[in-house]
């Protein structure tokens, strides 16, 4: 059995009971080393296999092979495993290799949901997720999606917004959005949601400071109706009040 588990954004309080129970039931836990530290309370003396960044295929293949050997394996992924996580890669590998492995997918709280709850209620109407990482998706494709989302007036949740190797991507995204969104459009940023160094702040499309944003950040750009009241970012659902 291979359980692909979304462990949420980092706080044990934001993990589902199903995820906790699956971790406790597993014989072996496989994951990115940073994420294995986040679930230490549930792994005890279990065997924990840690890998570094950019070794996702190796990590998933190891988990699959251990499950094939008869072990109860937990492969952990931050947030929800089916949103920029390991779930799809596991299913692709199992399908491509025509393997007979029981795979169970356990949902978790994705970063946008955790961030939204800290900022107010910015996702009350239609929204989309866009990752600014171009490691697996060509940047021109990402740019087209940003433009389309802006023109459609979606609230936009930017994942993987800025790293040492991609310092200009978020600024470029904001430049593209300036063609369809007002400079006064509210923007919310949350860093390390649910973790010890959690931070949050509100700004606007025109006043955004990109420097503090990193890979632990989630950036939410509002739509034409989004506003800030009493320090809370709100996107109206459309009720007549």
From Swiss-Prot:
Signal peptide: none annotated. It comes from Salmonella typhimurium (strain LT2 / SGSC1412 / ATCC 700720). It holds the Pfam family TP_methylase. GO terms for molecular function: methyltransferase activity. NCBIfam families: cobJ_cbiH, PRK15478.1. Its EC number is 2.1.1.-. The keyword Lyase does not apply. This is Probable cobalt-factor III C(17)-methyltransferase. GO terms for biological process: cobalamin biosynthetic process; methylation.
